[in-house]
From Swiss-Prot:
Biological function: The RuvA-RuvB-RuvC complex processes Holliday junction (HJ) DNA during genetic recombination and DNA repair, while the RuvA-RuvB complex plays an important role in the rescue of blocked DNA replication forks via replication fork reversal (RFR). RuvA specifically binds to HJ cruciform DNA, conferring on it an open structure. The RuvB hexamer acts as an ATP-dependent pump, pulling dsDNA into and through the RuvAB complex. RuvB forms 2 homohexamers on either side of HJ DNA bound by 1 or 2 RuvA tetramers; 4 subunits per hexamer contact DNA at a time.
Protein name per its UniProtKB record: Holliday junction branch migration complex subunit RuvB
Assigned EC number: 3.6.4.-
Subunit structure as annotated in this protein's UniProt entry: Homohexamer. Forms an RuvA(8)-RuvB(12)-Holliday junction (HJ) complex. HJ DNA is sandwiched between 2 RuvA tetramers; dsDNA enters through RuvA and exits via RuvB. An RuvB hexamer assembles on each DNA strand where it exits the tetramer. Each RuvB hexamer is contacted by two RuvA subunits (via domain III) on 2 adjacent RuvB subunits; this complex drives branch migration. In the full resolvosome a probable DNA-RuvA(4)-RuvB(12)-RuvC(2) complex forms which resolves the HJ.
Domain notes: Has 3 domains, the large (RuvB-L) and small ATPase (RuvB-S) domains and the C-terminal head (RuvB-H) domain. The head domain binds DNA, while the ATPase domains jointly bind ATP, ADP or are empty depending on the state of the subunit in the translocation cycle. During a single DNA translocation step the structure of each domain remains the same, but their relative positions change.
Annotated segments matching region Small ATPAse domain (RuvB-S): 183-253
Keyword DNA repair among UniProt keywords: yes
Family label: Belongs to the RuvB family.
Keywords, in A-Z order: ATP-binding, Cytoplasm, DNA damage, DNA recombination, DNA repair, DNA-binding, Hydrolase, Nucleotide-binding
GO cellular component: cytoplasm; Holliday junction resolvase complex
Length: 336
């Protein structure tokens, strides 16, 4: 499948740009109000007790601000944050090296934490519970366990697939937060703030139009903003107005609902099944995409907006999908 403009993952060339647009204060972080309120209370209490924060888990689709909110937590706690990802922690020694370099109250952020191996999790458990690292030296009867005390720290785990976390690991997080999709007004405000940082003039209706097509995701909203800005520059316009915005978004292949070719192909596959469940492996094979991408990238927004149902037997298109694609739902009697 070709690269999608609405891809939820951070593209390589966007990493430095995303950092420059990242909010650094609570007042700059738009949306997720309930989560912010709970975190502010926890941070205030931890600072008054002069303790580290409880370990916390953020879960939800990519691009909703798990990393950004973790940076703000570190800033509010006046401490350091170490960023890593589970696939980078291949051996227990990798984790030990990270943990032994943490200072008191530091934050360790592990992205894709559901991908930690069971062996790594076993090393992590005493570190989370007792701030202790158990290292086994040697093997067989001569093996010895050396215990190393660790400074109190906070582990922040981030995952797009909370269901894949082992129960023992999930139970060790004192706080768990589900990141929600953003509404259009929140996204429009994010777009306006980002435009200021980019020194780009933008009309309110343009920000609203980009927000409407951003799939409830700030990462996509910022990507579309930068792409529309490119179109404005080529048109020799210093202002992003509605005409330029509509032209750019249509050229980029993002419709009024934020759907692209991949979304429409997915929905067409389900709708044409006429109420019969379609298995994930069948969908992945038909779209030439891996099952994880289907589950983590394509389905969440469609599911949240009522375009499909997940059943034990597979995926089923809803009446909303049939109406969108103008594919009639056949009467069951006409199928025979």
């Amino acid at each position: 499948m070709k690269e999608r403009i609405v891809n939820l993952e951070t593209l390589d060339f966007e990493i430095s740009q995303e950092v420059s647009l990242r909010p650094s204060l609570w007042e700059d972080f738009i949306g997720q109000e309930k989560i912010k309120s709970n975190l502010q209370i926890s941070i205030c209490a931890a600072k008054k007790r002069q303790e580290s924060l409880d370990h916390m888990l953020f879960f939800g689709p990519p691009g909703l601000g798990k990393t950004s909110i973790s940076h703000i937590i570190a800033k509010e706690m006046e401490t350091n944050i170490k960023i890593t990802a589970a696939p980078m922690i291949e051996k227990s020694g990798d984790l030990a090296a990270i943990l032994t370099n943490l200072q008191a109250k530091d934050i360790l952020f592990i992205d894709e934490i559901h991908r930690l191996s069971p062996a790594i999790e076993e090393v992590l458990y005493p570190a989370m519970e007792d701030f202790r690292l158990d290292i086994i030296i040697g093997s067989g009867p001569a093996a010895q366990t050396i215990k190393i005390d660790l400074p109190p720290f906070t582990l922040i785990g981030a995952t797009t697939r909370a269901g894949m976390l082992s129960n023992p690991l999930r139970d060790r997080f004192g706080m768990s937060f589900r990141m929600q999709f953003y509404n259009p007004s929140e996204l429009a405000l994010i777009i306006k703030k980002a435009a200021v940082k980019l020194n780009q003039d933008i009309k309110q209706e343009s920000a609203d139009e980009i927000a409407k097509r951003s799939r409830g995701t700030p990462r996509i909203a910022l990507r579309l903003l930068k792409r529309v800005r490119d179109f404005a520059l080529v048109k020799n316009s210093s202002l992003m107005d509605l005409n330029i915005t509509l032209h750019a978004l249509n050229e980029l292949g993002v419709n009024e609902l934020g759907f692209d070719e991949a979304d429409l192909a997915y929905l067409s596959l389900l709708a044409n099944a006429q109420g019969k469940p379609v298995g994930l492996n069948t969908i992945a094979a038909s779209m030439r995409e891996d099952e994880g991408t289907i589950e983590d990238v394509i389905e969440p927004f469609l599911l949240a907006n009522g375009y499909l149902e997940r059943t034990a037997k597979g995926r089923i298109a809803t009446p909303k999908t049939h109406e969108l694609l103008k594919i009639p739902t056949l009467n069951p009697q006409t199928l025979f």
